[in-house]
Amino acid sequence: MGKAKAPRQLKDNEAKAVARTLRVSPQKLNLVASMIRGKKVNAALADLTFSRKRIAGTVKKTLESAIANAENNHDLDVDALIVAEAYVGKSIVMKRFHVRGRGRASRIEKPFSHLTIVVREVAEKGEAA
């Protein structure tokens, strides 16, 4: 057992928000997270608003939290933000049993996930850097 890995430090032009213990499998959540990765935040919010996935509302709420963190805590321009990172991690797994025939039972696993969204301020292409 080595030393615990230090969390990644945010740069000055970044802000993040984390949603923990979401009741959805990491595989399903990653489908929605990959949909917004690398997009401007306005386009990502529009995609999440009209997505038919059940978890899209929670992902939208987390993205709005990251945008609010960027604006209020880091003084970043909301119009120049992109979704730099959107990654999913495994959380706990609830175990339940399902009654089967002939007196047997089988296990049902109900997975949970963590979601982390990092937004980054980028310079507009028309501006001088």
Curated annotation (Swiss-Prot):
Assembly and binders: Part of the 50S ribosomal subunit.
The keyword RNA-binding is annotated on this UniProt entry: yes
Gene Ontology terms: biological process: translation
Gene for this chain: rplV
PANTHER family recorded: CHLOROPLAST 50S RIBOSOMAL PROTEIN L22-RELATED (PTHR13501), LARGE RIBOSOMAL SUBUNIT PROTEIN UL22M (PTHR13501:SF8)
Protein name from the UniProt record: Large ribosomal subunit protein uL22
Short name of one Pfam family: Ribosomal_L22
UniProt-listed CDD domains: Ribosomal_L22 (cd00336)
